[in-house]
Every structure is written in C-alpha cells, then in structure tokens.
Amino acid sequence: FFSVAMQVAAHEAKLGHGKLAEELRDMIDAAKRQGSTTGTASNLVPINKPRGELSGLLTVTYPKSRLCDMILEDAVSEKLKRTIKEQHLHSKLQEHGLSPRRKLLLVGPPGTGKTMTASVLAGELGIPLFLVRLDSLITKFMGETAAKLRQVFDAVGNVRGIYFFDEFDAIGSQRGLANDVGEIRRVLNSFLQMIEQDQSNSVIIAATNHPEILDYALFRRFDDVIEYGLPDQTQIAAMLKGRLAGFKSTRSAWK
C-alpha cells in the first residue's frame, strides 16, 4: 500500500502538483509511524476475547500444547486420541447422524494432567480455551449464579472452544448431603438442564479431584469419563527425560 501511495505522490509531483505530492508524502510518513507503534502483536485484541459481563466469567487462552507433550497411561491416551479424531471429523460424523464426543469429565488426584489435558485439546484442535471462573460464577444472591451460568452456556453456543470447569465439585456435589446448600442445588439443576440441551460444536470439560461426591446424574450427561492415576516409575522417568532433553548430562541415572 505504501509503495503504491508513493508512486501516486511521485506522479503528482511530475505533473507539477507539488503541494498535493508533499501532503501525500506527509500522510504516508505519519501512517508508517503509527503502524510501527500500534501494529505489534501484543496490542492485538483476540477475536474471541470475552467482553462485557463474560469477561469476568471466562478467561481465554490460546494454548499450543500437543498430546505428545504429555506422559499418560495408554487407556487415557487412546481416549484423548479418539476425542481429537472425532472432533476433526465432526462434520462427516454429523452427515451420518452421529455426534463426536465433546462432553468430558476428568477425574483423578491433583497433578495428574487434568488441567493440561484441556490445554492439549485446545492446542490440537486449534480453538481457544475458556476457563470458567468459579469465583465470579458463584455469588451469594439467589438466582444470580444460575443466570451467570446461562451466560456461559450462551457463549458455548456462540463461540466454538474448549470450556473448562475446574474444581467442578464446587457446583456438582451430590444433592441431599449433610452440607447441601439450597442455592448450589439449584445451580446444579440448571447445569444438568443446560448441558443436556446443549447442541453446540464446543467441547465442555469438567475436572475434579473428588469424584466420589459428584451427583450421580452428572455421569449420564458426559460422553466420556476419563480417570487419571498417579504415574508409575517408568512414566516419571519418561517425563523427566522429556523435560531435561535440552540439557547435556552424562550423570543421569534413570533406574
């Protein structure tokens, strides 16, 4: 664009329109200076960045992680590969009346890779990762939490992405427990209805360290329940090898 504009300015100068040519050059120089200060990637606003009230409910990231970055049990790895493959083929599956798995419940001890799994799926599928902020979702006012949850599910239908509910037992605990709270029960009822009615192309992931206290109705709403276990000695060694691959060492003993 700038080169074409400079050619126009030179042409006008040849025709004797010196003032016009000078004004064009000044405009080009000003545009170049403005572009150098505002055209950096750090100032670009992601097109899927939540706005308005959603900005307090969802945190968006664009992970680059891949499945090969994780050390997993074979059963877990196969389930994730199947999910990724089905998501890549979701249009073809829908043509045949089938639906890909897109509602996943991840259970297991802390530090076993549940949160990283959400990042890996987002990276493999090339879609944004939306973390649902439970601290903003849950409020003390009756009915407000369910209304905010509705906003989250509206976003699920409008923008394709990975929507991740971490520490899901905060809103998914069994109804009827001794410490049951009426407002959380209503939130759970709303969640059960919304996730069952959801027909979007987004992937919904919930993760918890305490599957034993989840409400039984939740397990029927998810397409797949993936159980993570603590790594064995072989997996720990493989993880350390991957992390230390860029370092030179002749004294590492992996056994």
What would you call each of these model-derived segments?
Residues A13-H17, G246, K255:
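AAA+ ATPase "lid" subdomain C-terminal helix
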Residues T61-S65, S173, S249-K255:
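Short conserved motifs of the RecA-like P-loop NTPase core
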Residues A75-K79, K85-R251:
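Walker A/P-loop NTP-binding motif of AAA+ ATPase domains
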Residues F1-K85:
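AAA+ P-loop ATPase mechanoenzymes
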Residues K19, E23, Y163, R251-A253:
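Alpha-helix N-cap and coil->helix boundary residues
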